[in-house]
Regions:
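Short His-centered aromatic/hydrophobic patch
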Residues: 67-72, 88
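Aromatic "clamp/platform" in nucleotide-sugar-dependent glycosyltransferases that forms part
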Residues: 217
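Short hydrophobic beta-strand element within catalytic cores of glycosyltransferases
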Residues: 234-237
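Conserved acidic donor-binding segment of nucleotide-sugar-dependent glycosyltransferases
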Residues: 249-260, 268-273
Length: 316
C-alpha cells in the first residue's frame, strides 16, 4: 500500500508535528508513505503547485491520497483517479464559508472524511464522516523525572505551561493572563509560552512544570492536552473540542469556564492536587497512542481502496 500525504508546507516547520508523527506511525508498521507539501498561500499559491502534484502522482502509483485540512483536501480533489481521504482538524471549519464548503461540496466528493471530535461529526452529519483523533507518541511523551534538555526553569516559582504561543487569538492568552494576575497576589507564578521548543523539550516541559493551562476559545482535539496526559501532567482547560471527554475522571485535571476567577480557582485546585495524574492510563485506555490510531487509519485506507476497486470492476 502506497499513500501520499498532502498538506500545507507553509509553517516554520514545513509540516505540523502531529502530521509528521502520524506519517511516522504508519511507516513504523510497514505502510509506504510519501509527502507532498503545498508551498504558497492563497488560491494562486496553491494552484502553482498543481503541475508538481500531477507529476508526482503520475510518476508513482499511489493507492490513496490522505490530505490534511480543508484547503489541502480541495487541492487533492483536483485529480479524480486516486481515492482521497481528508482529515479536518477543527480549526479549518470554524468559518461559516469553510464549513459550508466542507459539508456541501468537499465531503460529498471524498471517499472518507476524518474528523477529530464528536461535535464536528454531528455538525457535518454525513455517512462518510468518521471520528479519529490524532494519536500521541507515547514513547516520546512519557512520565520522566530526568531532564534531558536545558530548560532552565525557575524552581523557586510555580511553573505553568501555556498551551501555545501568546499571539494566537484563538488560544485566548488574555484569559490566562487575567487568571494568573489574580493568583500572583498570593502565589509566585511563571507562565511559560509554548513557542520555539522542539519535541523533546516539550516532553521535558510537561514533566517539569506544575501544570498545563489551556484557555482556548475553540479546538479540535488538542495534541498538547493528550501529550500532557501521556506525561501525567495536571491540566486546567476550557471546555473545547474533545477535552472534557479526554479528561473525564482524571484526578488533578479540571475543566474551567471563561471566567478568570474560575480559571484561577481551577489552577489552585490543580496545584493543591500536589502530584502527577493518571492521565496516561486514561489516554491509553481510549486507544489514543500513535500505534493504535495508525492501525485504525490503515483500516480506513483498506476500506476505501477495496470499495474503489469494486466500483471499477462493476463499472466495466
Amino acid at each position: 500500500m502506497r499513500i501520499l500525504f498532502v498538506f500545507s508546507g507553509n509553517s516554520a516547520q514545513k509540516i505540523s508535528p502531529f502530521i509528521e508523527e502520524q506519517i511516522n506511525s504508519l511507516l513504523d508498521i510497514g505502510i509506504d508513505v510519501d509527502k507532498f507539501a503545498i508551498i504558497g498561500k492563497g488560491i494562486t499559491g496553491y494552484l502553482s503547485n498543481l503541475k508538481r502534484f500531477f507529476n508526482t502522482i503520475h510518476n508513482k502509483k499511489y493507492n490513496l491520497i490522505h490530505a490534511h485540512y480543508i484547503w489541502s483536501i480541495i487541492f487533492a480533489l483536483f485529480q479524480v483517479k486516486i481515492p482521497v481521504v481528508g482529515t479536518f482538524h477543527g480549526s479549518d471549519l470554524m468559518q461559516n464559508m469553510t464549513f459550508f464548503l466542507a459539508k456541501n461540496f468537499v465531503i460529498p466528493r471524498l471517499n472518507k472524511a476524518i474528523v477529530v471530535n464528536e461535535r464536528m461529526a454531528i455538525k457535518l452529519h454525513s455517512p462518510k464522516v468518521i471520528i479519529l483523533p490524532c494519536g500521541v507518541n507515547v514513547n516520546l511523551f512519557i512520565p520522566n523525572n530526568s531532564v534531558t534538555t536545558n530548560l532552565s526553569l525557575n524552581k523557586n516559582k510555580i511553573n505553568i505551561l501555556f498551551s501555545s504561543n501568546f499571539q494566537r487569538p484563538e488560544k485566548n492568552y488574555n484569559l490566562a493572563k487575567q487568571a494568573i494576575d489574580l493568583l500572583q497576589q498570593h502565589i509566585d507564578l511563571n507562565l511559560i509560552e509554548l513557542k520555539g521548543f522542539n519535541r523533546n523539550e516539550v516532553s521535558d516541559l510537561l514533566n517539569q512544570v506544575d501544570l498545563l493551562l489551556m484557555t482556548s476559545i475553540w479546538e479540535g482535539s488538542p495534541q498538547i492536552i493528550k501529550e500532557a496526559m501521556a506525561c501525567n501532567c495536571p491540566i486546567v482547560s476550557t471546555n473545547v473540542g474533545d477535552v472534557k471527554w479526554l479528561l473525564d475522571g482524571v484526578e488533578g485535571c479540571f475543566i474551567t469556564t471563561n471566567d478568570p476567577k474560575d480559571v484561577a480557582d481551577k489552577i489552585k485546585k490543580a496545584l493543591n492536587f500536589k502530584g502527577r495524574t493518571k492521565g496516561r492510563d486514561k489516554l491509553i485506555s481510549l486507544g489514543l497512542d500513535s500505534e493504535h490510531i495508525a492501525k485504525k487509519i490503515i483500516k480506513v485506507y483498506e476500506e476505501v481502496i477495496n470499495n474503489t476497486s469494486k466500483k471499477k470492476v462493476y463499472g466495466r
